[in-house]
Amino acid sequence: RPIMSATETAYVKNTKLYDLRLISTIGFDADDVAAVQKADGVVAAAGSVNADFIWQHDNKERVYRAHMLTDNINEPVLTAGRMPENGSECLIDSSRFSEDMIGQTIEISDSNDEDTKKNFKYSTYTVVGLADSPLYIHTLRGTTSLGDGTLQGFVLIPEDGFDFEYYTELYVTCTDEFPLYSDAYDDYIDTFSDTVESAATASVNARFDRLTSDGKAEISDAENELNDKKAEAETELADAKAQLDDAKETITSGEAELADAKKQLDDAKA
């Protein structure tokens, strides 16, 4: 359990660091976030995404983690510049960069694989400010599966700077007034987490059921369409066969008439 000073505790509270972080294998949508927001004890809930990526800076490839800027949770503290105004702008780690970076661009390196690239709406982002983030209270920035396994810093990007169908994580803050990481806080969070997870699970399961139902309906519609086309094709085939039979009958009748005419001609000659 981390030992936090009064200053750190105040910082965490002022920046609205999350109390719970939920993850779902099928992700979260706006309805899931709204369902969690309505749960007892919830102050704020926000869907988010993050993505590790390789950025070539100063002729070296380093790995950074891009986080989505969220409202009322995990609020950054601007140390220089301004907040992003659109999806192609970003904030960068104030402990890793100087103000000289403001106005420069971050490029999602070509050495990133396609799965990484598709997380980002743009290939470059303009740095408009430096910031601290409550997600990184201490010096270390964490580990990653990319590069040498070490994160060099963070980047903060607005939601419309990412390209995703669902949120990959859901942050929640609660109404408790207990000292952070105290026994009372831990006890409260244990109960609170059950409430929040139940609300999230119910919403996600309902969405999964809808998706499954929609998928089954699409399959049923496709099967019905296939059967209709099959029946239509069989009808057309039967019609074509009937026309062919009629044609054969006409030919046979014509041959008989021709034979009769020939016989009549032969009889006349005799």
Residues covered by each model-derived region:
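Membrane transport/envelope proteins' first extracytoplasmic loop
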Residues: R1-A270
